[in-house]
Amino acid sequence: MEDNLPVNVREYQELAKKALPKMAYDYINGGAEDEHTLRENIAAYTRIILRPRVLVDVSKIDMSTTLLGYTMRSPIIVAPTGGHKLAHPEGEKATARAAASCNAIMVLSFSSSCKIEDVASSCNAIRFYQLYVYKNRNVSATLVRRAESCGFKALLLTVDTPMLGRREADIRNKMVFPRSGNLEGLMTIDDHDTTNGSQLERFARATLDPSLSWKDIEWLKSITSMPIFLKGIVTAEDARRAVEAGVAGVIVSNHGARQLDYAPATIAALEEVVRAVAGAVPVLVDGGIRRGTDVFKALALGARAVMXXXPVFFGLAARGEAGARHVIEMLNGELEVAMALCGCRSVGEITRSHVMTEGDRIRSLL
């Protein structure tokens, strides 16, 4: 065991900031415009209070949960984010091995800096694939077929990006993204000129389809047998519409606060979505997870599992595969302690009564 290992995600973030070029760090840690939602994604968790129960035999803690019939060691999933080679030469292959060693599901981003096939062959594990629907539907269909043939078990369709949000740090830094081998031969985009902004902006303008609508869910279902989650749901209205569309699950997400500033923090939107879905499909949540207690709070508010991207990226940047693995292990360890101290022997015993939200406190004063 190395001396002076980081003991929390914040310390890994500090190491990552030192290790990464400014452009790469700002990309993974930045948000849209004023970054209000970026700050709120984390701050909103701090305003939820835990309500521990005592005198419970917690000598055995079971953090395992299931999703789509697959058993996970804990309800922590590695969320999709592109460009892991910004953090480490082995990119997503190193992240995939770290997740597999923790029996955690990894979601591979469409903009992975490693090919789908290379990540799939890097280790045996349950993996999901994140997708956009492009103007050229054949590109999306090809990526779906490749993921399916490589054994990916589900699709996460990102639905909050008809166009790219204004990520001012990326514009200022003239962000250049690692080439994604997944798109070789599928599209040719002249995105090298960053004179008037980031490479990501040019790519998004050329490829993302602003006409994407609910009818495209039917199209996607028609070309794959993989279950489909919609990623980017923050309202009850869209949650109910998603259930009506026949998707396998919804993910409460604001795209890491990179799209619409002043959108709700995801943990603040979670309970609204959970109530709207009413148990019809599992609800996941991402954004702002920095502690095991954050995971506990999300589960108490109805999430089946949480997704964390930035913490794992920080670990990868700081210490490679070992760092990414350690971050997942730390979050698992913190969750185990939180469960024990709140009197919960399994994730099924984590209930709404274990937390008090801002809304609860206000209602108690009325």
From Swiss-Prot:
Its cofactor is FMN. Pathway: Lipid metabolism; fatty acid metabolism. It is found in: Peroxisome. The active site is at H255 (proton acceptor). It is an enzyme of class 1 (oxidoreductase). It catalyses: a (2S)-2-hydroxycarboxylate + O2 = a 2-oxocarboxylate + H2O2. FMN binds at residues 80-82, 109, 130-132, 158, 231, 253, 286-290, 309-310. It comes from the Eukaryota. CDD domains: alpha_hydroxyacid_oxid_FMN. Keywords: Fatty acid metabolism, Flavoprotein, FMN, Lipid metabolism, Oxidoreductase, Peroxisome. It holds the Pfam family FMN_dh. A motif (Microbody targeting signal) lies at residues 364-366. Its main location: other. The keyword Metal-binding does not apply. Its EC number is 1.1.3.15. GO terms for cellular component: peroxisome. Residues 1-360 form the FMN hydroxy acid dehydrogenase domain. Oxidase that catalyzes the oxidation of a broad range of 2-hydroxyacids to the corresponding 2-oxoacids, with a reduction of O2 to H2O2. May be involved in a general medium- and long-chain fatty acid catabolic pathway such as alpha-oxidation. Homotetramer. Belongs to the FMN-dependent alpha-hydroxy acid dehydrogenase family. This is Peroxisomal (S)-2-hydroxy-acid oxidase GLO4. The lineage of its organism: Eukaryota, Viridiplantae, Streptophyta, Embryophyta, Tracheophyta.
